[in-house]
A protein has these predicted regions:
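Long, basic N-terminal domains or extensions that often function
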Residues: 1-283, 288
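Function-dense linear segments that define catalytic or interfacial modules
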Residues: 279, 286-314
């Protein structure tokens, strides 16, 4: 049993596309593997704005063998009056790959027919995945797709890398002008170079080391901690907003929060208007004081750390 890992490295995908795309990718991949008689465990998904990934553990190295019964010519055509196989029976046996002596006669609704039991040996899983993975990628639905570089393929955003591993082996295939391999990009600003992934088990750890938190739960938790830390530093507390946390986590690869201020005269504007403006238009978190009143500041989430964070938001 091996672990399968597929990562599609892209330009920045809209935050709202990511969740549905991951659901589709994982469901489609598991169905295609089941249909191909590849035993497998559960799927786990990963993502950032610049990548969509799915991991499947306990993947068999070969297809499950399949035994099927194939009907041939009618008995009277396949065997002569003495019960010996005719040319028709011999050709049927040759066609399905069995010995003439292995042929049987079966009663059917249409009469008695020559039949053969044929056992299909399982193909290597890597061979099957060379066909399956491109189908999964191109079959991923998005509200809008785009073409690029005059290629006859579409995706949410241009594809730059494809990481495809079964255990420590690459699953080789091409999609447009991109070949699969064992490389993924680090953080766009803090580590823009490619990194080598030797095995799926190293994926999360290696990307974390290049400032990419690909685990959705880990990145969400960091967003919450960063927002809480920044709001405390500003002298207040963040206005709870789980939905905004989910949105923001898909806007960044390595969340770093900063507090900004606005003119306190804007607090004369109805609370709901201020919150909506910050939340919907800027994806900012509102900050409240101990009495629950809005403070003239907000928390913004950055995708990189600067030398002087005070210059980022004022």
């Amino acid at each position: 049993m091996e672990t399968l890992l597929l990562e599609i490295g892209t330009e920045e995908i809209p935050a709202g596309y990511i969740g549905p795309a991951l659901d589709s990718m994982s469901a489609t991949l598991l169905k295609k593997m089941t249909d191909a008689r590849i035993e497998h465990g559960r799927a786990r998904v990963f993502a950032t704005p610049r990548r969509l990934a799915v991991e499947v553990k306990k993947v068999a190295n070969k297809q499950t063998p399949l035994t099927s019964e194939i009907l041939g010519p009618p008995e009277k055509v396949g065997f002569d009056k003495a019960g010996k196989p005719t040319v028709a029976a011999k050709k049927f046996a040759e066609k399905v790959g069995v010995s003439v002596n292995a042929l049987k006669v079966k009663d059917t609704d249409k009469g008695r027919y020559v039949c053969a039991k044929v056992k299909e040996r399982g193909l290597p899983t890597r061979t099957l995945l060379k066909r399956i993975l491109p189908e999964v990628i191109l079959g991923t639905p998005f509200p809008k797709t785009m073409k690029w570089a005059e290629l006859d393929i579409e995706f949410a955003r241009p594809i730059h890398t494809i990481l495809a591993l079964l255990g420590d082996k690459v699953i080789p295939f091409s999609l447009g002008d991109t070949k699969s391999g064992r490389y993924a990009f680090g953080h766009y600003f803090m580590h823009p170079k490619k990194v080598k992934i030797s095995h799926p088990k190293d994926y999360i750890k290696i990307l974390r080391s290049v400032k990419v938190l690909v685990d959705l739960a880990e990145r969400r938790k960091r967003v919450e901690k960063e927002v809480e830390k920044a709001s405390k530093k500003a002298g207040g507390a963040v206005l709870p907003d789980d939905e905004l946390v989910d949105i923001v986590k898909n806007l960044v690869e390595y969340p770093i929060a900063t507090a900004g201020k606005f003119d306190k005269n804007f607090l004369d504007v109805p609370r709901e208007v201020l919150i909506t403006a910050m939340r919907e238009h800027q994806k900012y978190f509102a900050v409240i004081d101990k009495k629950g009143k809005l403070m003239p500041c907000f928390i913004a989430m950055n995708n990189t750390r600067t030398r002087d964070m005070n210059l980022v938001a004022t």
